[in-house]
């Protein structure tokens, strides 16, 4: 058994850790983006309705 090669369980542990970190990272980004998108959509809709109302006068 070569000294360079790590044990199999260690490799699996690292892979699982990496997977968890990536999943958390992606989930956080998506959540933040969703919140900002919703906020911007609400602001945009409000400004559009106001603009439409002003145009109708």
Curated annotation (Swiss-Prot):
One of its GO terms (biological process) is symbiont-mediated suppression of host NF-kappaB cascade. One of its GO terms (cellular component) is virion membrane. Residues 1-8 are virion surface. It is a single-pass membrane protein. Interacts with host TNFRSF1A, RIPK1 and IRAK1; these interactions interfere with host NF-kappa-B activation at the level of receptor complexes. Interacts with host protein UBQLN4. Belongs to the rubulavirus small hydrophobic protein family. This is Small hydrophobic protein. It comes from Mumps virus (strain Enders). The gene is SH.
């Amino acid at each position: 058994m070569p000294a360079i090669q790590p044990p199999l369980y260690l490799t699996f542990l690292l892979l699982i850790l990496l997977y968890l970190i990536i999943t958390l990272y992606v989930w956080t980004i998506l959540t933040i983006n969703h919140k900002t998108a919703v906020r911007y959509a609400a602001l945009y809709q409000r400004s559009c309705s106001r603009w439409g109302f002003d145009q109708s006068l």
